[in-house]
Amino acid sequence: MSVKGKGFPLDLGGSFTEDAPRPPVPGEEGELITTDQRPFSHTYYSLKNDGIKNETSTATPRRPDLDLGYEPEGSASPTPPYLKWAESLHSLLDDQDGIHLFRTFLQQENCADLLDFWFACSGFRKLEPNDSKVEKRLKLAKAIYKKYVLDSNGIVSRQIKPATKSFIKDCVLRQQIDPAMFDQAQMEIQSMMEDNTYPVFLKSDIYLEYTTIGGESPKNYSDQSSGSGTGKGPSGYLPTLNEDEEWRCDQGGEHERERECIPSSLFSQKLALDSSSHCAGSNRRLSDGREFRPGTWREPVNPYYVNTGYAGAPVTSANDSEQQSMSSDADTMSLTDSSVDGIPPYRLRKHYRREMQESANANGRGPLPHIPRTYHMPKDIHVDPEKFAAELISRLEGVLRDREAEQKLEERLKRVRAEEEGDDGDVSSGPSVISHKLPSGPPMHHFNSRYSETGCVGMQIRDAHEENPESILDEHVQRVMKTPGCQSPGTGRHSPKSRSPDGHLSKTLPGSLGTMQTGHGKHSSKSTAKVDSGNLHHHKHVYHHVHHHGGVKPKEQIDGESTQRVQTNFPWNVESHNYATKSRNYAESMGMAPNPMDSLAYSGKVSMLSKRNAKKADLGKSESASHEMPVVPEDSERHQKILQWIMEGEKEIIRHKKSNHSSSSAKKQPPTELARPLSIERPGAVHPWVSAQLRNVVQPSHPFIQDPTMPPNPAPNPLTQLVSKPGARLEEEEKKAAKMPQKQRLKPQKKNVSAPSQPCDNIVVAYYFCGEPIPYRTMVKGRVVTLGQFKELLTKKGNYRYYFKKVSDEFDCGVVFEEVREDDMILPIYEEKIIGQVEKID
């Protein structure tokens, strides 16, 4: 049963037409039917063979790329060819559609000659080397040479190497036509396309749009491939169709032309806008109350046009709108309405979601096909193995050198740390941290530091050296003298730890104030001495100087204050201990003790100053009043603090040199009071800047830190002090000596009679740095100091000139500053000091 007429092939290539035949009835797949002649008033297809009998099977559209000519029922769909194009360049060039799409891309990039030259070389190589075709091969070789190789401005000629050009030229001139004469040039062009144009093509808009719409976009050429069908139909997504409108071919053409003008980046946005306008139009029609029922079209969806990448309206609207149009309550129960007849939108949400999923499965409009990432061979795979091995070896050697350098650096750092730890081990063999053994009581954040100091005095601590506290002090002084290099303490630092030898606690301290006997016997003196000697905390062998000269309070006032402090019964914990240590360290860091030996002997003399009568107390008050300064502006107050700090430090050095003190006086002084005022409590014992520091705890203790204009100091030694003018120091010392009573002046000489004499193997080094008015002072081991050792003391490295003061009769003044240039030269000594000037070389 066949008739002659205008027929059209059934292979539509996945395109949709309104005249497409329906799928056959099961069991009649092999029956041949004829296509009826129909008038196509608005069709897109150009029908070619008029009057030719066209007999086809309506079972399955023919697919010439398959073995059987069609896809068997139940078989899985193969990978689309446009996804195989991303595997390699050869996969792209083996497919006709891929070649057309790639050529279109190259034409847009003005480099289509690359692909033409590649195919020309392939065709030339396939020519049979017969004698009859020699002339044809020669003409073809000359044409390829003139069009692509000889033209120096062409893109192919620019990509071919000069050696390859000369080889092809020689072959053409000598007429030695070889089928492989263009192979080298073809490989160079192919390599260039694989590295440049092919990856760019895979990321281009034309390829991405082609894969997104399921391989329909580029089929608008006049020369279609064999698998593309013979007709030119609408390609890509179908336009959005509202419920009350009818789709027309010319409307689809308008949408198609509009889509071609839209970039691929804006294509998805247009779909979203179309979808939203569709929903808005549906809601508008519902609100107007119009009822539209297009008819009873209940045929199932054509399975041959399902899952082709069409993205029409949303899934629920596409399927459920058809079902709702058939019902009588389509206007009141439409799912596009947010209220759904007054039912809250959150009710039966799971049920609606399930229905939406079922509708999606029924429509078959799942997500768009997945585009796999392109897998390319590594670029280094074409490298010569010898070059690759050489480059790899050089890189591995570089890595090995870096690792060896890191290992050497780590070893050096370990040695430096071991040396530092060895120095620390010589000083403290068994450190005892009091703050770690204290019971955890409730923290007291707001209290005066003197209360914590008093609580520390009131403790009973048992020591391994309980019967001989002088040995602790002697050993401590010897250890500190061996290692003078350390940092001076301050309130800004952490709480220093106890480094007394074998000074561990036999039992933890109680949470409140310890009770002590109120008698004036020997046991009271011992226990009190133990407390102070056990609480000598040091931060890396630091000297602590306790200022205890000046006036004291009357005895009645001291008794009243001590009674009040005992009645407060505040807990002694880690926080209070830290505050006490910080307050003591502040007074000690100011350098207020006469010398280091005096500060150590102070711990054994708990109540030495309590013997003074009211007359001496008044004298001390007047003396302390003479030290107080009037209220001055902030800058002048800072400078005054610095000057007073310098003078006090120099007084301590002079006292340390002139007097030999002993710590044995700690035993000989009988205590008269248990609770004695400490240096911070006594009004005459604190200098004006210390009093200001106690009033304003926020300010740092170091005077230089308060002034941001001052340069930062290097880390000083424990004996480091700033040097001031000798005349001012001597005058201040004479004034103090004149005011001090005779008995008090003789006391320092009586203290350290039994103490060992301090070795004098250190020398003072002071230097003025780059014209600064205040010199830097430090102590260096040994009496012989070279210029190289002096340079190590400088914290700022650079090109300097070094001048040192020495005695000379060359000038009237008797002294000169001599320049020293060699690092091994010994520096001159002037008045038991090395005084130098460091000047920067411009």
Curated annotation (Swiss-Prot):
Name of the gene this protein is made from: axin1
Entry's Gene Ontology molecular function annotations: beta-catenin binding; I-SMAD binding; identical protein binding; molecular adaptor activity; protein homodimerization activity; protein kinase binding; ubiquitin protein ligase binding
Ranges where the record places region Interaction with beta-catenin: 434-508
Composition skew (Polar residues), residue ranges: 34-46, 316-339
Alphabetical list of SUPFAM superfamilies matching this protein: Regulator of G-protein signaling, RGS (SSF48097), Ubiquitin-like (SSF54236)
Protein name (Swiss-Prot/TrEMBL): Axin-1
Compartments (UniProt record): Cytoplasm; Nucleus; Membrane; Cell membrane
Species annotation: Xenopus laevis (African clawed frog)
Domain RGS positions: 88-211
